[in-house]
Amino acid sequence: VASCGLWYHRTLYSLRAVQATSLVIVIVDFHTHSLASDGALAPMELLRRAKAAGVSQFALTDHDTTAGYLSVRHSSEAHDVGLISGVELSCRWATTTIHVVGLNFDAAAPEMVAMVERLTNARQERAQKIATRLAGVGVHGALEGARAIARESQIGRPHFATWMSESGAVTSATEAFDKYLGTGKIGDVKMFWPPLTEVVEAITVSGGVAILAHPLKYRLTGMKLRALINDFKLAGGEALEILNGRQPDVDIKRLSQLADGCGLMRSVGSDFHRDFEYGPNVGVDVARLPDGAYVWDALETSG
């Protein structure tokens, strides 16, 4: 596999060509979250929000689970928004936690099922450790409380924070993080995520496209960011997320140049969790994007 600087072998089409030949793809969104992970809306409600926004290609990319996608994939709303399979998988690169979005894979593929199960188990083990640590400082019943908040969602620290606030252990979820759950606090249990290479392989072997999510969020130096992108491509990654939520044009331009220089397609998404957190709504208007090779050129929408 070629390193950064050499163009990717797949035949791609520019955004300008897409706009010239079709008026269907105007608003897309390949990075969103529902109640199945840490979003605020039920999967069906999120699809309806996407439909109202005029989205024509859409992916529900919950953290380390495909449950939300599976629950709505055969609905009429899924057809209306051009729903494809999606997930945002956690992994590690060197000492940094990285997120990789997978799109348009077979959700029933053994490799994908095994990876989701592996990550779900890791989250459950971390939840148990968090609860044990909290009990050690007098906060009892945290695991049961967090699970009740999470219900069918992937359990995480926000669920503990919500339960602690509602139970009176703290005055707010913010206080829960400040005192117990934030970085360096008693409930900050580190995860041992699978390596980047294994997560990318699970996506690609399952027939999907692997996308490096929000590259600037990791706060890497320029040299380390280029090294990450190069390793991502060597592992089989195919696209770089150049926009997620609200980003200035200078960041979009920089990430576009990095993608082009490494022969990667570009992807975009709102990273929608709830209203006015990362962006006002689902959907990205492609008219604001610079010309280039975008991931939707290589996707086939499932009905």
Where are these regions (language model features)?
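Charged catalytic cores and adjacent phosphate/nucleic-acid-binding surfaces used
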Residues: 8-53, 67-108, 116-119, 171, ...
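Active-site beta-strand/loop signature of hydrolases that rely on acidic residues for catalysis
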Residues: 58-64
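Flexible, glycine/proline-enriched loop segments at strand-loop-helix junctions
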Residues: 113-122, 148-150, 186-187
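Conserved phosphoryl-transfer catalytic core
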Residues: 121-149
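Conserved acidic, metal-coordinating active-site core of Asp-based
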Residues: 153-215
